């Protein structure tokens, strides 16, 4: 079966609500493990997931006025309760400072259900993130991407993001090489 890209009309993009907390934590865990799980020891992976992809963490993020979370509901779910993809942005970047931007936004996470990759959800969420940053007066959108993830780097480059620095990212006790990417708005 060939998956076809979804049309913008068939995607329901909305802001996350409290009822989404469990689904966001679950999708975050599943997407991270599917893409990167084999890179880490069981202990490091478990520590990272317990720190970064729990309902408690998502609840704190959802309550944070400095963060916004958008979701796209999974197509064809009659309940409308299954999230196919999500994007988290912060209104002030927490990444290491490597640019002269005065008001940078940060794209924290953009995750798609592993079975739905390639259907346009990531593109729709990326458009949303850039739109939110521009509307709020940000002068730059920044993100961190794993150095050995060329597919993600190409995806972000389509939106004008370029490498501005080499940085690191911690997964448990493991330190990953990351690339700081940014685009001026």
Write out the residue ranges for each language-model feature.
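C-terminal "cap" of GNAT-fold acetyltransferases
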Residues: 100-105, 139-142, 146-153, 157-185
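Active-site acidic-Proline motif in GNAT/NAT acetyltransferases
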Residues: 113-115, 119, 147-148
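Acetyl-CoA-dependent GNAT
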Residues: 15-19, 26-39, 46-115, 126-128, ...
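Short coil/turn segments at alpha/beta junctions that flank glycine-rich nucleotide-binding fingerprints
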Residues: 119, 136-139
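Short histidine/acidic/glycine/proline-rich micro-motifs that form metal-
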Residues: 44-46, 147
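Conserved N-terminal entry element of GNAT/NAT acetyltransferase domains
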Residues: 1-22
